[in-house]
Amino acid sequence: MTTEKVNLLDFDRKGLRTFFAEELGEKAFRAEQVMKWIYHFGCDDFDQMNNINKQLREKLKAKCEIRAPYVSEAQHSADGTIKWAMRVGDQDVETVYIPEDDRATLCVSSQVGCALECKFCSTAQQGFNRNLRVSEIIGQVWRAAREIGLEKETGRRPITNVVMMGMGEPLLNMKNLIPALEIMLDDLGFGLSKRRVTVSTSGVVSGLEQMIGQIDVALAISLHAPNDKLRSEIMPINDRWNIEAFLEVVRRYIASSNANRGKVTVEYVLLDHVNDGTEHAHELAELLKGTPCKINLIPFNPYPGSPYKKPSNSRIDRFQKTLMQYEHTVTIRKTRGDDIDAACGQLVGDVIDRTKRTKAKQFDGQAIPVKTL
């Protein structure tokens, strides 16, 4: 009988120290040495860890492994964006690398599929299967860093920012999200600034409540409508936590956070003749008066079978100018990777069981109203 090996990517620093002490009978500092090899050097071979004694290396080889998702497919956009299908178990999730002049952002998935069924999102139309483990979340960053390689060797910019905006709702996977974020921030992990790690949520209020005082990262909220009636039509989660409840906890989170510099990023996808009218812009501006924020407008990225369209440039421009009359900071997101379906809302992956919507639609014992496909 073969005993399954323990994947060390499933542990943040605290968890790894505990595992080394309690399960391996080793001093905690050894855990930190191994952690540095894993994340600073991208090492997944214990024999290469030359400051670890042979006895411990043999013990690690017998009981442990360093196993990240592997790339099953890679697509390269004309603008430099890369979309990877990362194999997790017997399924794929999608991870996107977005290079810019002064940074390189990695868009990371938190679930296989998504249970929230936002009407404009391609991922949601694929159904939900399961939450990703810590190793499958942080492993996307580990694998991407290895694929990109050193800038001097590949000419590609190393990853400077991580956004939890891939497949899934991050705050419905808190158990695995928090340790993964800790590794991103840890000096022995990827050592990213808390201002360079962003979590995006569609409005899981109870998850955001948990984050207050527990983890400090940049926050982006998927609002996408200026009133409850319209938001409930395109985002069923609004029937569980309405806009007022959502914004109230958002204000408390950013007040407790240093990473957000006192402001939250409000994401607003523009759907042609659905939520992009001048009246919607006025209503949105009034709604956000009490919430320190910057507004990021996202012109809809079409996908096959979608009932929505991208607004004309004139409608997008008019919406932005209306918001700016209220002295809001408003940007329009530049579409990246749309030629490989890697743009916002286009990620699909490979969801084997498209009917499974069980645990992930339960939060604090309350059912989130989502339809079963």
UniProtKB/Swiss-Prot annotation:
Query: Gene Ontology cellular component?
Result: cytoplasm
Record Gene3D superfamilies? 1.10.150.530, Aldolase class I (3.20.20.70)
Q: One MF term in GO for this entry?
A: rRNA binding
GO terms, biological process: rRNA base methylation; tRNA methylation
Q: Where is the active site?
A: E94 (proton acceptor), C344 (s-methylcysteine intermediate)
| Residues the entry annotates as binding S-adenosyl-L-methionine | G168, E169, S200, S222, L223, H224, N301
Name any cofactors this protein relies on: [4Fe-4S] cluster
Question: Which Cys residues form disulphide pairs?
Answer: C107-C344
Q: Could you tell me the EC number(s) of this protein?
A: 2.1.1.192
- Alphabetical list of InterPro entries matching this protein: Aldolase_TIM, Methyltransferase_A, RlmN_N, RNA_MTrfase_RlmN, rRNA_lsu_MTrfase_RlmN/Cfr, rSAM
Which top-level enzyme class is recorded in the Swiss-Prot or TrEMBL entry?
transferase
Cofactor, how bound (note): Binds 1 [4Fe-4S] cluster. The cluster is coordinated with 3 cysteines and an exchangeable S-adenosyl-L-methionine.
Designated name of the protein: Dual-specificity RNA methyltransferase RlmN
Species per Swiss-Prot/TrEMBL record:
Vibrio cholerae serotype O1 (strain M66-2)
